[in-house]
């Protein structure tokens, strides 16, 4: 027992020796509060060497050591000295600590250089809002906007550590402040912005910029790139090459995306010259905290190029005449074929409406299809597909036999007791003979008919390899008791027949009975009524687009593009729900134009006034097709400042709606008539003062079918000083015209009209027609009623036929079975129904006469009758309108030349009118035409694709017989930069 007490005493001596005692800090306590700029002294006493540390920092300034005691002295304390100070016994690592507060009356929270807090999702985030006074109470975390904290956010407040947010989530991101109460006063820290970086939840996704299989020829270069992203930078990306392949160079790149600090990595494997042994699987591996992802590419290296064909159809095909047949060939090739063609019996085939050739390629597969539309007998034969890529070639042949119906081509008899029947068809017709007692009846369909098989001689007269086989059959007549003999030719289940009368018999019948006569008469009357109704229906005018786009010229004949065949780009589609309709701008027999507000047309927050074309609810399918054709033509033409441009369309989920620019001043004709009283005339050759022009009653009324003006017309005399100043600023470029007052500058209804305005209208219409001509487009109804005006008195050419009732419009005269604007038509259009670019030039001359007569009707006082037509043929032309300068009348006369070839093209007209414009007007037009047009969202890119159109010289064309404008699939949208104006 005494032995145990001795062991216990010894162990206690070793356990509680003086060197293991904990250091002591003076002053005592858990914390010390020091005033701002006051001295601070801390002493640490221990058995051995002591050292001061501050929050794990190994060194602290101001420390002195003497005989196992370490003193820390700070002469002027400030908030930067706040924190936990640790006294460490260097040998035993025993420690004691104390927290120092430095009271700052102006800053209840220590100022921090850190305002942006970055944390990983799932980690804890520390907001370093340290209190300078331990008496601060109710330390809380709030958002800077005083909104409620995010759902699920938990935090721990501490005067020494600030606020610790636990398990941070992406939804916690935002601005936070620390608040508390100090001496009955609410205090708050400065703002802290918390950013939470997400952590991956799955292995990375690899995007490969290469097909699953890559084929190369020896010594070609190999580039394989794989990409991946990760929410942080802890990701690895590498390539693994197959065994036996040559060393490959791998280039890597890394960048941080602005979205959520996502890091994007890419790795590119490069072999400058591949070898056969490089064939194999190349694997890209990406690794993050959640695992590894792989994507692989198989590389095949060949000595030279190859081609392997795989015909979809059998080599020999039979098809009925009139049916269509699709021949398909699929090729695996590398490189892709340089040449591929179809031929028929050794003659090359081209893409036509009867032979439609379609080619497709994907990676290393090339396919070609030949569609034979409604095969004819003459199209039976051998079709061959050939392709080559320089290293290899393929040749595949299809043998096509066209099955035709049987046809009795000749028959004779009975002659000398024998009848003869000749039939043709493919395959060779099978001829059979039948006897029956019924006269003039098909014996083969009778129950008691007899088939003749013994006395029949059948021979083949003609049997080409491809085409109809001609077969002759003869039969000896030996059965006098039968009255009818039938020859039946059969091919593939189809029959043709002819009947022979064996003996002449008088058969009584009541062919012309009263009942039969009455039935035939009623049928004839009914047919006559149907013919009349059909004629009346065909005479009824139908809606069609006036603008015609030329595809080619054959001699002096035009070939127009079928607008139904033009493509419709669905990027022009606009949601119906974003349209709010207003008043009707114009209404006609077929449809109407309605003012509407489009929301989100240019951008998501935009609101734009537009004009919407639509058909009436009673529209027929042909009229719906015509409106769709007009939409496709507008897409094809593209944008120009002097035509009414397309903005969008609604073709899905309801009736077709065509959305175009809204022209606030209506049509030019009514605008000119409305401005007559305030017109200011000045001519180059004489002085002319302000005039009031009395409205002629027959011209003063607004057109019944015109485009409604959406701004109030000026009343009284608008020649006030303010109008003069506005006009002067518009013409001379004074500082009155500001970008911020653009709407005020364009309030043109309050301004008068002068000769410079008329020249501007003439110039703008000529520019628009020059653009349409460059697109090989003929207008066919160019007149002031089809010119609209918008802000800034910008003239825009349109086709307003949809909203005009030509049956009630006196400008359209009945000629044949159509209503035509005869007074605007050229002689060749009136007498020969020929519409050309030059006929549009003639109509433009009439339009000039309308402009400089301020809206008078052409050929005033002359009805359209036989005398009118005679005068036009004899060369009668109108005199100069009252307000036309001499040069403008000379342009009119040149437009009215009897020889279409002598009429100036619109390019020359533009040059001549531009010489008469003032520099101010030119400058204004250049400003307008150089502006970027308002394009709907998503159309800018699509509008960059254009079809290269080359204008034709229409009249008296001496070119080769055919000059196609559109080659098969080369129909695209009009390109960008339609608003650049070249100055002459």
Swiss-Prot record:
Keywords: ATP-binding, Cell membrane, Disulfide bond, Glycoprotein, Immunoglobulin domain, Kinase, Magnesium, Membrane, Metal-binding, Nucleotide-binding, Phosphoprotein, Receptor, Repeat, Signal, Transferase, Transmembrane, Transmembrane helix, Tyrosine-protein kinase, Ubl conjugation. Residues 22-514 are extracellular. PROSITE patterns: IG_LIKE (PS50835), PROTEIN_KINASE_ATP (PS00107), PROTEIN_KINASE_DOM (PS50011), PROTEIN_KINASE_TYR (PS00109), RECEPTOR_TYR_KIN_III (PS00240). It comes from the Eukaryota. Residues 1-21 form the signal peptide. It is a single-pass type I membrane protein. The modification Phosphotyrosine is found at residues 558, 560, 690, 707, 812, 925. Residues 737-749 have a biased composition (Acidic residues). InterPro entries: Ig-like_dom (IPR007110), Ig-like_dom_sf (IPR036179), Ig-like_fold (IPR013783), Ig_I-set (IPR013098), Ig_sub (IPR003599), Ig_sub2 (IPR003598), Kinase-like_dom_sf (IPR011009), Prot_kinase_dom (IPR000719). One of its GO terms (biological process) is positive regulation of cell migration. The active site is at 781 (proton acceptor). Residues 23-97, 98-197, 203-300, 311-395, 398-498 form the Ig-like C2-type domain. Residues 711-749, 936-963 are annotated as: Disordered. The chain crosses the membrane at residues 515-535. Residues 579-926 form the Protein kinase domain. Its main location: membrane. It is found in: Cell membrane. Ubiquitinated. Rapidly ubiquitinated after autophosphorylation induced by kitlg/scf binding, leading to internalization and degradation. Autophosphorylated on tyrosine residues. Phosphorylated tyrosine residues are important for interaction with specific binding partners. It holds the Pfam family PK_Tyr_Ser-Thr. Its EC number is 2.7.10.1. Glycans are attached at residues 227, 260, 314, 351, 395, 448, 476. Disulfide bonds join 44-87, 129-178, 144-175, 226-284, 421-487. Residues 944-960 have a biased composition (Polar residues). Tyrosine-protein kinase that acts as a cell-surface receptor for the cytokine kitlg/scf and plays an essential role in the regulation of cell survival and proliferation, hematopoiesis, stem cell maintenance, gametogenesis, mast cell development, migration and function, and in melanogenesis. This is Mast/stem cell growth factor receptor Kit. It comes from Takifugu rubripes. The gene is kit.
């Amino acid at each position: 027992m005494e032995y145990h007490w001795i062991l216990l005493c010894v162990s206690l001596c070793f356990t509680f020796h003086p060197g293991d005692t904990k250091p002591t800090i003076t002053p005592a306590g858990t914390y010390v509060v020091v005033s701002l700029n006051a001295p601070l002294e801390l002493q640490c006493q221990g058995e051995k060497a002591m050292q001061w540390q501050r929050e794990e920092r190994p060194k602290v300034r101001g420390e002195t050591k003497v005989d196992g005691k370490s003193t820390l002295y700070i002469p002027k304390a400030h908030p930067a000295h706040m924190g936990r100070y640790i006294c460490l016994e260097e040998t035993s690592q025993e420690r004691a600590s104390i927290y120092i507060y430095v009271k700052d009356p102006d800053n209840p929270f220590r100022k921090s250089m850190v305002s942006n807090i970055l944390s990983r999702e799932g980690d804890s985030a520390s907001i370093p809002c340290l209190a300078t006074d331990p008496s601060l109470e109710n330390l809380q975390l709030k958002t800077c906007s005083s909104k409620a904290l995010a759902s699920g956010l938990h935090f721990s407040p501490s005067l020494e550590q600030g606020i610790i947010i636990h398990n941070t989530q992406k939804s916690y991101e935002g601005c936070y402040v620390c608040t508390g109460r100090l001496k009955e006063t609410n205090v708050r820290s400065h703002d802290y912005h918390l950013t939470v970086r997400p952590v991956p939840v799955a292995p990375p996704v690899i995007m490969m910029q290469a097909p699953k299989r890559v084929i190369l020829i020896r010594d070609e270069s190999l580039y394989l790139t794989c990409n991946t992203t990760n929410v942080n930078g802890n990701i690895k990306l590498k390539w693994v090459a197959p065994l036996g392949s040559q060393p490959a160079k791998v280039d890597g790149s890394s960048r941080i995306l602005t979205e959520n600090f996502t890091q994007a990595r890419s790795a590119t494997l490069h072999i400058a010259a591949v070898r056969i042994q490089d064939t194999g699987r190349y694997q890209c591996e990406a690794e993050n905290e959640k695992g590894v992802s792989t994507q692989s590419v198989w590389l095949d290296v060949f000595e030279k190029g190859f081609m392997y064909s795989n015909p979809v159809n059998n080599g020999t095909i039979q098809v009925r005449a009139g049916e269509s047949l699709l021949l398909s060939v699929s090729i695996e090739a590398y490189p892709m074929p340089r040449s591929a063609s179809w031929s028929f019996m050794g003659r090359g085939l081209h893409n036509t409406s009867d032979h439609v050739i379609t080619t497709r390629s994907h990676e290393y597969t090339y396919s070609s299809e030949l569609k034979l539309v409604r095969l004819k007998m003459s199209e039976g034969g051998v079709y061959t597909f050939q392709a080559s890529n320089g290293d290899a070639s393929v040749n595949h042949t299809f043998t096509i036999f066209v099955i035709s119906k049987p046809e009795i081509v000749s028959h004779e008899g009975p002659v000398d007791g024998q009848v003869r029947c000749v039939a043709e068809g493919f395959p060779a017709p099978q001829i059979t003979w039948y006897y029956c007692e019924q006269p003039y009846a098909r014996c083969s369909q009778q129950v008691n008919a007899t088939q003749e098989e013994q006395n029949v001689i059948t021979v083949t007269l003609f049997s080409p390899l491809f085409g109809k086989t001609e077969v002759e059959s003869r039969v000896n007549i030996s059965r006098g008791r039968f009255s009818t003999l039938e020859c039946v030719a059969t091919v593939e289940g189809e029959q043709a027949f002819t009947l022979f009368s064996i003996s002449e018999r008088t058969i009584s019948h009541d062919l012309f009975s009263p009942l039969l006569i009455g039935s035939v008469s009623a049928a004839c009357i009914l047919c006559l009524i149907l013919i009349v109704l059909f004629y009346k229906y065909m005479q009824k005018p139908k809606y069609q687009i006036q603008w015609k786009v030329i595809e080619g010229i054959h001699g002096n004949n035009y070939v127009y593009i079928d607008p139904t065949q033009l493509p419709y780009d669905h990027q022009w589609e606009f949601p119906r729900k974003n349209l709010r309709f207003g008043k009707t701008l114009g209404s006609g027999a077929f449809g109407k134009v309605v003012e509407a507000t489009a929301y989100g047309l240019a951008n998501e927050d935009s609101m734009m006034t537009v004009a919407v074309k639509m058909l009436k609810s009673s529209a027929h399918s042909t009229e719906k097709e015509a409106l769709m054709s007009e939409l496709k033509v507008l897409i094809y033409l593209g944008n120009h400042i002097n035509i009414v441009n397309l903005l969008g369309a609604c073709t899905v989920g309801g009736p077709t709606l065509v959305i175009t620019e809204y022209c606030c001043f209506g049509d030019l004709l009514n605008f000119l008539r409305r401005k007559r009283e305030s017109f200011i005339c000045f001519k180059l050759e004489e002085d002319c003062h302000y005039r009031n022009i009395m409205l002629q009653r027959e011209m003063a009324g607004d057109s019944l079918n015109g485009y409604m003006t959406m701004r109030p017309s000026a009343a009284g005399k608008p020649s006030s000083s303010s109008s003069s100043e506005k006009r002067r600023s518009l013409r001379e470029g004074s500082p009155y015209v500001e970008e911020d007052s653009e709407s005020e500058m364009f309030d043109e209804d309050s301004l008068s009209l002068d000769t410079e305005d008329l020249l501007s209208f003439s110039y703008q219409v000529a520019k628009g027609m020059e653009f349409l001509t460059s697109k090989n487009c003929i207008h066919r109804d160019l007149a002031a009623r089809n010119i609209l005006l918008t802000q800034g008195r910008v003239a825009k050419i349109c086709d307003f036929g949809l909203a005009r009732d030509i049956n009630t419009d006196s400008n359209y005269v009945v000629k044949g079975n159509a209503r035509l604007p005869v007074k605007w038509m050229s002689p060749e259009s009136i007498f020969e129904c020929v519409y050309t670019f030059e006929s549009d030039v003639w109509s433009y001359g009439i339009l000039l006469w309308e402009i400089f007569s301020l809206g008078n009707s052409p050929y005033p006082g002359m009805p359209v009758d036989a005398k009118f037509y005679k005068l036009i043929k004899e060369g009668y032309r109108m005199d100069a309108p009252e307000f036309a300068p001499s040069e403008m009348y000379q342009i009119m006369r040149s437009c009215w030349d009897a020889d279409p070839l002598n009429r100036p093209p619109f390019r020359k007209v533009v040059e001549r009118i531009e010489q008469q414009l003032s520099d101010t007007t030119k400058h204004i037009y250049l400003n307008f035409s150089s502006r970027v047009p308002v394009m709907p969202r998503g159309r800018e890119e699509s509008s960059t694709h254009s079809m290269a159109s080359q204008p034709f010289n229409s009249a008296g064309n001496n070119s080769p017989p055919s000059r196609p404008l559109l080659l098969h699939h080369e129909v695209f949208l009009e390109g960008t930069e339609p608003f650049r104006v070249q100055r002459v």
